[in-house]
């Protein structure tokens, strides 16, 4: 996914080319070892009684729970891991297309299509209106409402007919604290707003969810999360920490810190950049000679200028505002790149 994103932006081409063999080995691992039981999903489990019981980004021992509060036991197929795998398959297909390898392109496009269909069938909880955070060892859905499902919007694996219900759940009072997205719904068993992964707010997680919401056209919901994060940063000296508590904003005037949170922390420091991209609705596909750009400024922001955006070996500046000619002015974009002034939908194939 990372190398595919770098290629889409047209940056560090030599570095990406150098790392492609490593990416190919990672794909081999997914195909040969990641899916231990052959059900089409990447699972994790530990081979000894030591090490991490949970091996997704929520790696605390109690980070994956059923809605009734029970802690799920491995092997577990996490929803966001399938979403990342979907993204990796698509990136592999596009790299193959670049070099004229139509066999590999067709194979990984097909794998991505199959994974998406299976995911929307097996992880979807129709009666609840959200995706399970994972499947347990018996392939039963782990049915708690979590922030993980926002990562699925982010990669585009979610069928569009399910996206609205997912979006509504993510920005509901049970999930949105006013500062950011809780890792676990406050209506779920095991919820603790001052836990590591069972009700706290992680800025990078919220930024990814906001990006996913915008990808499916829910710009108002995305902006709501982004403004929550910006307010949280302002209340904490302009710096977003690794995480903070999931207590409701209405209860206290500032976010309550997590006792051992890292600050600064790389994930959190990068979050405002993703939020900025989300507001710009910027989606470059440089290898195909296209860049989608459709800024949608929220109420209260009348002008925005972003300079130095690295695209296709150039540095691009975007100005947005009511006093800007045409509402948007882009400078520095190479002439061979077509600028498409609309958001790219998740189903758009290039």
Per-segment meaning from a language model:
Residues 89-90, 149, 206-207:
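Residue-level signal for cytosolic alpha-helical hairpin/rod architecture
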Residues 95-110, 114-122, 126, 214-224, ...:
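Beta-rich accessory regions
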Residues 8-11, 35, 94-101, 124, ...:
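Short, flexible helix-adjacent loops and helix caps
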Residues 261-305:
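Catalytic cores of secreted or luminal carbohydrate-active enzymes
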Residues 12-31, 84, 88, 92, ...:
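Extended, well-ordered alpha-helical scaffold segments
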Residues 1-64, 79-82, 86, 142, ...:
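Aromatic-rich carbohydrate-recognition surfaces in CAZymes
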Residues 36-77, 114-201, 234-257, 273, ...:
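Extended glycan-interaction surfaces of carbohydrate-active proteins
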Residues 95, 212-219, 232-236, 278, ...:
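Short hydrophobic alpha-helical module
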């Amino acid at each position: 996914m990372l190398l595919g994103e770098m290629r889409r932006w047209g940056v560090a081409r030599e570095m990406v080319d150098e790392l492609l063999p490593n990416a190919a080995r990672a794909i081999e691992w997914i195909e040969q070892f990641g899916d231990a039981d052959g059900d089409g999903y990447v699972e994790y489990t530990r081979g000894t009684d030591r090490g991490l019981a949970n091996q997704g980004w929520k790696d605390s021992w109690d980070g994956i729970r059923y809605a009734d509060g029970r802690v799920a036991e491995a092997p577990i197929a996490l929803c966001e891991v399938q979403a990342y795998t979907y993204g990796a398959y698509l990136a592999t297909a596009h790299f193959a297309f670049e070099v004229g390898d139509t066999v590999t392109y067709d194979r990984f496009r097909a794998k991505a299509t199959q994974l998406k269909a299976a995911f929307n069938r097996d992880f979807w909880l129709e009666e609840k209106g959200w995706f399970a955070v994972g499947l347990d060892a018996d392939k039963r859905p782990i049915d708690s409402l979590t922030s993980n499902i926002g990562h699925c919007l982010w990669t585009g694996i979610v069928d569009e007919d399910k996206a609205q219900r997912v979006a509504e759940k993510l920005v509901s009072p049970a999930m949105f604290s006013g500062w950011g997205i809780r890792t676990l719904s406050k209506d779920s068993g095991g919820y603790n707003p001052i836990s590591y992964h069972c009700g706290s707010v992680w800025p990078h997680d919220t930024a990814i969810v906001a990006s996913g919401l915008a990808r499916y056209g829910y710009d108002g919901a995305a902006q709501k999360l982004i403004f929550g994060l910006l307010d949280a940063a302002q209340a904490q000296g302009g710096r977003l920490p690794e995480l903070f508590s999931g207590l409701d904003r209405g209860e206290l005037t500032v976010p309550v810190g997590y006792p051992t949170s890292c600050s600064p922390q790389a994930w959190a420091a990068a979050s405002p950049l993703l939020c900025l991209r989300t507001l710009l609705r910027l989606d470059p596909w440089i290898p195909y000679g296209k860049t989608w750009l459709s800024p949608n400024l929220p109420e209260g922001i009348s002008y925005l200028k972003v300079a130095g955006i690295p695209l296709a070996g150039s540095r691009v500046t975007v100005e947005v505002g009511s006093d800007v000619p045409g509402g948007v002015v882009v400078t520095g974009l190479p002439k061979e790149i077509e600028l498409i002034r609309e958001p790219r939908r998740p189903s758009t194939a290039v």
